[in-house]
């Protein structure tokens, strides 16, 4: 018996009538290229999935499985914070991920690209418990190569699939239309974001509207205030309306288009550190910048981050 545990099984849109199919065919060809439909997903939609294959999904495309009891019962209600835990509970013994690649032969490097978190955590969990796990990387040359923490050596995996058939167009749905209501909500959201804060944006028109509103706030402050005042009959006291002098830190499981625009606009630029004590000192303003001063050393000493005074 095969149990597939995955986030989202995406298939190209199909028309339900001859007219719909004629309309969609050129659009689908342009947007999705040679993206292959997942056979198990097609069988699931048609209610023809073999009984020895079970699919558990922790995300589902809205409306795809209306009236499909088997697919609905296979849904796992979770979020990315707990995905690795909930996948391990399913008793998995193989993890496979599409990866980006750079170089050839001994110089080959792989990148878990835009979705590295789950695989790393699953591998760590299984290694800590001494449980067997076959790790498979499938190279897709069209995946974006993300560096730093997402970059790994091929030796991390037990199997690296280099079949050219695995290189295909990525699934990229068109952006949803941003409505006036979306923009209004985005403006309100942008007025709640503190300079020096942390930002998470999801997929969809609300995220796009919020990103645009943050850019307007930073670049066109007077216009931002004027529009916000028209939406707030009780005034904008207590709202965040100034430009981003310190910048924001972007923290999200999704690298959405709005994030890219905020990076290009210089708004997402705040650096953070993988040290809770050091980061708290920075957040509290006890360490102002990267210049090491006597005040910096005193703050580190008082916090226990430096364990003994330094002498000349």
Predicted regions and their residues:
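Conserved alpha/beta enzyme-core scaffold
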Residues: 1-312
């Amino acid at each position: 018996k095969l149990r597939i545990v995955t986030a989202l099984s995406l298939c190209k849109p199909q028309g339900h009538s001859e007219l719909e199919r004629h309309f969609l065919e050129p659009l689908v060809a342009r947007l999705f290229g040679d993206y292959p439909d997942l056979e198990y997903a097609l069988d699931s939609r048609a209610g023809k999935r073999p009984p020895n294959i079970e699919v558990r999904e922790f995300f589902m495309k809205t409306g795809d499985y209306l009236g499909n009891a088997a697919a609905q019962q296979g849904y796992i209600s979770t979020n990315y914070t707990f995905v690795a835990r909930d996948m391990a509970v399913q008793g998995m013994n193989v993890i496979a991920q599409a990866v980006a690649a750079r170089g050839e032969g001994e110089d080959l490097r792989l990148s878990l690209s835009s979705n590295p978190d789950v695989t790393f955590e699953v591998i760590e969990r299984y290694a800590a418990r001494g449980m067997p796990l076959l790790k498979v990387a499938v190279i897709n040359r069209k995946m974006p190569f993300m560096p730093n923490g997402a970059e790994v050596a091929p030796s991390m995996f037990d199997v690296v699939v280099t079949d050219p058939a695995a290189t295909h167009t990525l699934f990229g749905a068109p952006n949803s239309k941003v409505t006036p209501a979306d923009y209004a909500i985005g403006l309100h959201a942008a007025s709640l974001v503190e300079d020096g804060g942390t930002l998470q944006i999801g997929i969809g028109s609300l995220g796009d509207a919020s990103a645009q509103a943050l850019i307007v706030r930073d670049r066109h402050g007077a216009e931002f205030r004027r529009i916000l005042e028209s939406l707030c009959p009780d005034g904008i006291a207590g709202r965040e309306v100034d430009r981003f002098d310190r910048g924001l830190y972007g923290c999200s499981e999704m690298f959405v288009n709005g994030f890219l625009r905020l990076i290009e606009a210089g708004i997402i630029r705040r650096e953070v550190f993988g040290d809770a004590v050091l980061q708290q000192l920075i957040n509290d303003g006890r360490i102002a910048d990267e210049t090491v001063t006597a005040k910096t050393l005193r703050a580190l000493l008082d916090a226990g981050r430096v364990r003994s005074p330094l002498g000349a």
